Every structure is written in structure tokens, then in C-alpha cells.
């Protein structure tokens, strides 16, 4: 179980890592990979459904476009989060119990989301899939925010931002 004391102590460890200059610049592929997988999945599911269930071409096209557009939005959100995650020092990621818990929870949410989208694609085509995918995405986003937000992930982001500001100020002087 994660306590406030564990979070505070790990934030102090993170600040020490950041002060020593251990911030990494992750590769673009590391950030984009899961988002591209989600986007591809959201396009693939309605295509698969169109081969298994007879429907109009316009319904398939609508479902694919809706899934692709929503997948693109998710791609950018996931890439931003992954870039922040991979910018943390590697040693900190290996030893941090908070980051390990958050990472495992996000993997579960990822798998559940992919499964729900797959099942939803068989409930209806076209606009039904589009609205359903949006609804599922919004509900999952709220659940993730409620669950992960408890760990005050904002503290990690603040620590990284303060490091970036300090580096900019030191270059100006």
C-alpha cells in the first residue's frame, strides 16, 4: 500500500536525481508506441467487424474515421504522458514503488480499454461505434484520473518543471 510518507520520500529522492542532472530525453518512438497501438486498434476493430457482420460501406467508413480521429487524440495524450514518464531518471523508475504501482495500473487500464473497444465494435457500426468509443474513452479517462490522481502525480511533474526552469535561468545568467 502506498502512503503519503512513501510519496513524499520518493519525491525527495526524485528531486535529488533531478538536481544531479539525471533527466533523460526520451526517444519519440518510446512516447508514440502505445498511442499508435491504440489508434491502430480503434481503426482495426470496426474493420474486423465489417468483415464479420454485413453492413453498409458508409457505416464502416464512419466507424473507421471516428475510431481514427479518437485514436489520434488519444495518441497525443498518451505520448505526452509517456514522454514525462521516460524523462524521469532510469534508476528512480527501477526503485520507485509509486511509479511501479502507477505503471502496473495503467497497463491494466490499457488492456481493459482495448477489450471494451473490441467488444463495443461488435455492438454496432458507424455512428454507434463512434459515440460508444467516445463514451468509453471519457468514462475510462475519469476512472484513470480518479485512480491515478490519488498518488499526486502532479508532484513529479512539478519537480521536472522546476528542473527545466532552473536550467533555463542558469543559462541566462
From Swiss-Prot:
Keywords: Cell inner membrane, Cell membrane, Conjugation, Membrane, Plasmid. Involved in surface exclusion. Its main location: membrane. It is found in: Cell inner membrane. The gene is traS. This is Protein TraS. Induction: The expression is positively controlled by the product of TraJ. It comes from the Bacteria. GO terms for cellular component: plasma membrane.
Amino acid at each position: 500500500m502506498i502512503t503519503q510518507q512513501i510519496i513524499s520520500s520518493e519525491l525527495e529522492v526524485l528531486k535529488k536525481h533531478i538536481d544531479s542532472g539525471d533527466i533523460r530525453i526520451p526517444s519519440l518512438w518510446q512516447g508514440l508506441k502505445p498511442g499508435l497501438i491504440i489508434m491502430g486498434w480503434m481503426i482495426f476493430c470496426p474493420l474486423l467487424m465489417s468483415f464479420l457482420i454485413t453492413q453498409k460501406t458508409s457505416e464502416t467508413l464512419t466507424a473507421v474515421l471516428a475510431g481514427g480521429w479518437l485514436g489520434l487524440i488519444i495518441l497525443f495524450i498518451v505520448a505526452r504522458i509517456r514522454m514525462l514518464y521516460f524523462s524521469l531518471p532510469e534508476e528512480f523508475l527501477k526503485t520507485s514503488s509509486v511509479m511501479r504501482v502507477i505503471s502496473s495500473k495503467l497497463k491494466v487500464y490499457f488492456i481493459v480499454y482495448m477489450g471494451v473497444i473490441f467488444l463495443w465494435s461488435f455492438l454496432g457500426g458507424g455512428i454507434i461505434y463512434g459515440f460508444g468509443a467516445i463514451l468509453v474513452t471519457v468514462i475510462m479517462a475519469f476512472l484513470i484520473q480518479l485512480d491515478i490522481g490519488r498518488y499526486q502525480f502532479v508532484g513529479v511533474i512539478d519537480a521536472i518543471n522546476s528542473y527545466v526552469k532552473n536550467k533555463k535561468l542558469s543559462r541566462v545568467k
